[in-house]
């Protein structure tokens, strides 16, 4: 659903922030 997709997107963004800190 929309909520699950948003959650996945948030998790992916969080991982990117950890792996590639600006």
Swiss-Prot record:
Protein's cellular compartments: Secreted
One GO term (biological process): defense response to Gram-negative bacterium
Gene Ontology cellular component terms for the protein in this record: extracellular region
Residues annotated as transmembrane: none
Main subcellular localisation: secreted
Record carries keyword Secreted: yes
Keywords, alphabetical: Amphibian defense peptide, Antibiotic, Antimicrobial, Cytolysis, Fungicide, Hemolysis, Secreted
Tissue: Expressed by the skin glands.
Function noted in UniProt: Has very strong antimicrobial activity against Gram-positive bacterium S.aureus and yeast C.albicans, and very weak activity against Gram-negative bacterium E.coli. Has strong hemolytic activity against human red blood cells.
UniProt protein name: Antimicrobial peptide 4
């Amino acid at each position: 659903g929309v909520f699950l997709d948003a959650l996945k997107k948030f998790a992916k963004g969080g991982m990117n922030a950890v792996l590639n800190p600006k």
